[in-house]
Amino acid sequence: MIRLAAIDVDGTLTDRDRLISTKAIESIRSAEKKGLTVSLLSGNVIPVVYALKIFLGINGPVFGENGGIMFDNDGSIKKFFSNEGTNKFLEEMSKRTSMRSILTNRWREASTGFDIDPEDVDYVRKEAESRGFVIFYSGYSWHLMNRGEDKAFAVNKLKEMYSLEYDEILVIGDSNNDMPMFQLPVRKACPANATDNIKAVSDFVSDYSYGEEIGQIFKHFELM
């Protein structure tokens, strides 16, 4: 029996313009009323996921920066990684490449966001990996992360917090940066707009996209 759903935000609950699906909100609230714990896992910053938790009524902890930091139900913020090294890397690379800071870095605590011109991506990726960092593009922003800082880390943290088995957890996501949590032995589902890699490892692929899929997924797994 599934007891917890860990859900990505951009492209999973939102459309191409990053507007949240009202149908997704209704489905989440219906499932929560039946006892499901819902957690959001986003690449965005804590102020954003905190606001989503409060205004959408999410009943579980929410994670920002792809699992690097969490806002818990007791009102505390728990930081699992540092951005000291990633910020220094950005500062260094910005002097030699087109890698440059973005607005949301003023709120980031566990990772670093950036923009970059396409011709510099391979070089910066190799430099990052040689120093124990990982870079990826979420479809909305470039992220510079510490190794091991990903959504699988967040799901494992939830598993520990709620004393769950993997088969009691459902993950829902749409893009390749969700893949770490899809590689865990959990239940997996995705919207129709998901990447082929995510679809290939999903237990259920919805006919609907951009948040409209949440109700169908929850019904498939008998959560509402």
From Swiss-Prot:
Which residues are in coiled coils? none
Q: Quote the record's binding site residues for Mg(2+) 1.
A: 8, 174-175, 178
Which terms in the GO cellular component ontology are assigned? cytosol
Give the EC number(s) listed in the UniProt record: 3.1.3.18
State the free-text cofactor note.
Answer: Binds 5 Mg(2+) ions per homodimer.
Q: Does the keyword Hydrolase apply?
A: yes
Q: Report if keyword Metal-binding is assigned.
A: yes
Arranged from A to Z, the UniProt key words for this protein are: Carbohydrate metabolism, Hydrolase, Magnesium, Metal-binding
Q: Which cofactor does it need?
A: Mg(2+)
Q: Where does Mg(2+) 2 bind?
A: 11, 174
GO MF term list: magnesium ion binding; phosphoglycolate phosphatase activity
Query: Which amino acid positions bind substrate, per UniProt?
Result: 151
Q: Which reaction is this enzyme known to catalyze?
A: 2-phosphoglycolate + H2O = glycolate + phosphate
* Sites where the protein binds Mg(2+) 3: 10, 43
Q: What does this protein do?
A: Catalyzes the dephosphorylation of 2-phosphoglycolate. Also has significant, but less efficient, pyrophosphatase activity, since it is able to catalyze the release of phosphate from inorganic pyrophosphate (PPi).
**NCBIfam families in the record:** Pglycolate_arch (TIGR01487), PRK01158.1 (NF002245), SPP-subfamily (TIGR01482)
Q: Which PANTHER family match?
A: HAD SUPERFAMILY HYDROLASE-LIKE, TYPE 3 (PTHR10000:SF8), PHOSPHOSERINE PHOSPHATASE (PTHR10000)
Give the protein family.
Answer: Belongs to the HAD-like hydrolase superfamily. Archaeal SPP-like hydrolase family.
Q: What protein is this chain from? A: Phosphoglycolate phosphatase
Q: Which organism is it from?
A: Thermoplasma acidophilum (strain ATCC 25905 / DSM 1728 / JCM 9062 / NBRC 15155 / AMRC-C165)
